Design a protein with these regions (language model features):
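Short linear motifs in intrinsically disordered/low-complexity regions
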Residues: 6-8, 25, 132
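Exposed low-complexity, polar/acidic, P/S/T/G-rich flexible segments that act as propeptides
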Residues: 1-12
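A structural motif corresponding to the C-terminal end of an alpha-helix
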Residues: 127-136
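Conserved SGNH/GDSL esterase-like catalytic core that processes O-acyl groups on lipids
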Residues: 18-20, 26-126
Length: 136
């Protein structure tokens, strides 16, 4: 249930918090007014940092079959972000461009204990999540 103030604004425990978003064009908001992160931040009075990249992939070095070349790697954005340390909430999205460009799916490691095969979507995602858990 949402609670509103006298001006009709939602009173939320998220108000004043920082939302960090990384991902591809879906997170970037290419075909909407700033993406779902902006919708969430605006609705709940949050500060938004959106470092999503149009065309980005989970798997490094995937050649885009439409545009050619690589268009950015989500884990690289996350790893190099200075804004991430200030985030209260993190939203990550990806995999669409990997699938579109036929990146190998891969298999899960056993409990984040093995080496990650970052040439696969699964390995790249595991590595990124492990880095996030370790560093943030």
């Amino acid at each position: 249930m949402e609670v509103f103030d006298i001006n009709g604004q939602i009173i939320s425990p998220l108000a004043g918090k920082t939302l960090y978003v990384a991902g591809d064009s879906i997170a970037y908001g290419k075909s909407s007014a700033g993406g779902y992160g902006k919708c969430i931040a605006d609705k709940y009075g949050m500060t938004l940092t959106n470092e999503a990249v149009d065309g980005a992939t989970l798997t490094p070095n995937i050649t885009d079959k439409v545009y050619g070349g690589t268009r950015g790697c989500i884990s690289t954005v996350v790893t190099n972000s200075t804004a991430l340390a200030k985030a209260d909430y993190i939203l990550l999205e990806g995999g669409v461009n990997d699938a579109w460009n036929n990146a190998p799916v891969g298999t899960l490691t056993d409990g984040f204990a093995a080496a990650y095969d970052e040439t696969t979507m699964t390995g790249a995602l595991e590595k990124m999540l492990d880095d996030l858990a370790t560093n943030h």
